[in-house]
Structures are given as structure tokens and as C-alpha cells.
Amino acid sequence: EDYDVGGDMEWKRPSDPKFYITWATGKTFRVGDELEFDFAAGMHDVAVVTKDAFDNCKKENPISHMTTPPVKIMLNTTGPQYYICTVGDHCRVGQKLSINVVGAGGAGGGATPGA
């Protein structure tokens, strides 16, 4: 499945610091899914970071850093994944996303496929 991060709001500085937490709630991210971060070039970016960098909005030495929209990230490993915007105070005001990726056939929240 392909996910447009933030839906209609896309990837930008949110007015609600919990916006991206709320957006991700209830979604099951699986290996093989793709995240797409849409944003205005030069206004935002996407950095893949560690949990410590995510929790503390550390911008230095990200795992990877993409600045040209749209940024498409294929989910190819299970476990937690962390993304932030490194521009200004954007991460500190909530422009950050953490997800947990499950295996392609893994159960996500007990939902039955096709139910």
C-alpha cells in the first residue's frame, strides 16, 4: 500500500503537535508499503533518524536525508522507523513521524484481511 504522509495536509509544520501521531494511528505499515512525503521544495525535508534523534529532534548525522520532493521511501525492514523535518523548529513543533513496520504477512492489530 502507498501512504501519502499527512494526507491532505502533506508534510509540513503542523498546527497541532500531535498531527502526525494521529495520522499514523490505526494504520498498519507493512514491508513493501511506500511512504510518500509531499512538501514545498526548500521549505521542508525528510531525514531518516534514530529513536534518540527523533525523541530529541537531533538534526546531525541522520541515517539519510532527502531534500527534493516528493520523497518516496519503500518500507523494506520490520520494526520502528523514524522521520523528521530538519528545517528550523519544525521537528520540535511536531513535524516528525514514527511508525512500526510489520512483515508483509504479519498481523497488524488483529484485523482480519477482507473483513
From Swiss-Prot:
Q: Where does Cu cation bind?
A: H44, C85, H90, Q95
Residues forming the Phytocyanin domain are 1-103
- Check the record and name the SUPFAM superfamilies matching this protein: Cupredoxins (SSF49503)
Instruction: Spell out the disulfide connections.
Output: C57-C91
Q: Which cofactor does it need?
A: Cu cation
Q: How is it modified after translation?
A: Glycosylated at Asn-76. The carbohydrate content was determined to be 1.2%, corresponding to one hexose sugar per molecule. Strongly heterogeneous at the C-terminus with the majority of the chains ending at position 106.
Q: Which Pfam families match?
A: Cu_bind_like (PF02298)
Record's keyword terms, sorted = Copper, Disulfide bond, Electron transport, Glycoprotein, Hydroxylation, Metal-binding, Transport
Tell me which residues are glycosylated. Answer: N76
The protein depicted here goes by the name: Umecyanin
Q: What is the source species? A: Armoracia rusticana (Horseradish)
What is the phylogenetic placement of the source species in the record?
A: Eukaryota, Viridiplantae, Streptophyta, Embryophyta, Tracheophyta
